[in-house]
Amino acid sequence: MATPGFSCLLLSTSEIDLPMKRRV
């Protein structure tokens, strides 16, 4: 199972990736 820190990092990456895709 992924650690809480990894899950938080993954979630943050997803939140950043979505806006970037919308800009493109």
Curated annotation (Swiss-Prot):
Induction remarks? Down-regulated 6 hours following staurosporine (STS) treatment and up-regulated 24 hours following STS treatment. Down-regulated 6 hours following beta-carotene treatment, remains down-regulated 24 hours following beta-carotene treatment.
Q: Is Cytoplasm tagged as a keyword?
A: yes
- GO molecular-function terms, A-Z: receptor antagonist activity
Q: Which domain of life is it from?
A: Eukaryota
- The disulfide bonds in this chain are none
- Which GO cellular component terms, listed alphabetically, does the Swiss-Prot or TrEMBL entry include? extracellular region; mitochondrion
> Tissue specificity, please?
Expressed in testis and brain.
Q: What does this protein do?
A: Plays a role as a neuroprotective and antiapoptotic factor.
Effect caused by changing residue 13 to I? Decreased cytoprotective action
Query: Could you say which protein family the record assigns here?
Result: Belongs to the humanin family.
Query: What CDD domains does this protein map onto?
Result: humanin
What are the alphabetically sorted keywords of the record? Cytoplasm, Secreted
InterPro entries cross-referenced by the UniProt entry: Humanin (IPR028139)
Name of the featured protein = Humanin-like 5
* Any Gene Ontology biological process: negative regulation of mitochondrial membrane permeability involved in apoptotic process
Q: Which organism is it from?
A: Homo sapiens
**Name of the gene this protein is made from:** MTRNR2L5
Subcellular location(s) of the protein: Secreted; Cytoplasm
What Pfam families does the record point to?
Humanin
Tell me, in one coarse class, where this protein mainly resides: secreted
